Amino acid sequence: MAFTDRLLDAWYKGHPALALLRPLEGLYRRVVERKRARFLAGEGDIYRAPVPVIVVGNITVGGTGKTPLILWMIEHCRRRGLRVGVVSRGYGAKPPSLPWRVLPDQSASEAGDEPLLIVQRCGVPLMIDPDRSRAVQALLAAEPLDLILSDDGLQHYRLARDLELVLIDAARGLGNRRCLPAGPLREPVERLSSVDALLYNGAMADRGDGYAFRLKPSALINLRSGERQPVDYFPAGQALHAVAGIGNPRRFFNTLEGLHWRPVPHAFADHAVYSAEALTFTPALPLVMTEKDAVKCRAFAADDWWYLAVDAVPSDAFVGWFDQQLLRLSP
């Protein structure tokens, strides 16, 4: 087991050695609390966009289903006649310059895997830059927009925001509820009391403190041909290689098992860089990966490589609440 996997396991299942990291946790907490206090006091260089900004993020390390929910939000806003743009840090991207407009024919190494996925799926105007304030300004200079979605950036306080949504994995929760490096939290758990809404990925129903949403498999898509098949394309009991380089690979493997297949799991680091050699497994079986991984593998994909497209399905209560917020934010 890799070091990062062991650390995640300790954060979410407990380990006595984490007590040794509490002095560092104390230092980390003071830094992030001071940073937020400066934002609340209006100190520093804070940019407020001329259009509403909605931040979709989390306070935990690891995946929470953020990209599928952002895709849902883009389409939902478009159906209401809103022109939407997205800004992202572009983790792992190496663009020629910053800020950088992501286009569907770019490579994942240039644009970042998640931004490229979003643009290829729905063609939204999207700008990457670690400085999200600069990304928003560049995007507004390039496109007439009514609304900006910030992919992550909850802790990027230089960008003023009108709405904060925080996603939590319902199965893993907040782990030991401690901050880095003694736990998985980017900010103290008390931060959740100040956000506008919590969304629990995988929850069976809305909770007293937040809304439920789930990820619904929608299709199997061939990496080479683009052929689209229903999720029952493989028969029950089909053995296949399952590749996931996401924040929580186990969730993807569980999804495949829920479709009654027998996945041979191959977990990679989040934002992993792939090669044909790295994805050559024995025995020879069909290979199914996440859509986020697929954007990095099309150039060398084999004929029997597929990705599982998933769609976010939020609860009716969240949809109603979100529509109210859009009305409130509309000019």
Swiss-Prot record:
Pfam hit, one: LpxK
Highest taxon of source: Bacteria
Keyword field: ATP-binding, Kinase, Lipid A biosynthesis, Lipid biosynthesis, Lipid metabolism, Nucleotide-binding, Transferase
Any single GO CC term annotated in Swiss-Prot or TrEMBL for this entry: plasma membrane
Residues annotated as binding ATP: 60-67
Keyword Lipid metabolism: yes
Enzyme class: transferase
Catalysed reaction equations from the record: a lipid A disaccharide + ATP = a lipid IVA + ADP + H(+)
BP term (GO), one: lipid A biosynthetic process
Known pathway: Glycolipid biosynthesis; lipid IV(A) biosynthesis; lipid IV(A) from (3R)-3-hydroxytetradecanoyl-[acyl-carrier-protein] and UDP-N-acetyl-alpha-D-glucosamine: step 6/6
Enzyme Commission no: 2.7.1.130
GO molecular function list: ATP binding; tetraacyldisaccharide 4'-kinase activity
Function: Transfers the gamma-phosphate of ATP to the 4'-position of a tetraacyldisaccharide 1-phosphate intermediate (termed DS-1-P) to form tetraacyldisaccharide 1,4'-bis-phosphate (lipid IVA).
Family recorded in the similarity comment: Belongs to the LpxK family.
Protein name: Tetraacyldisaccharide 4'-kinase
Species of the source: Pseudomonas syringae pv. syringae (strain B728a)
Gene: lpxK
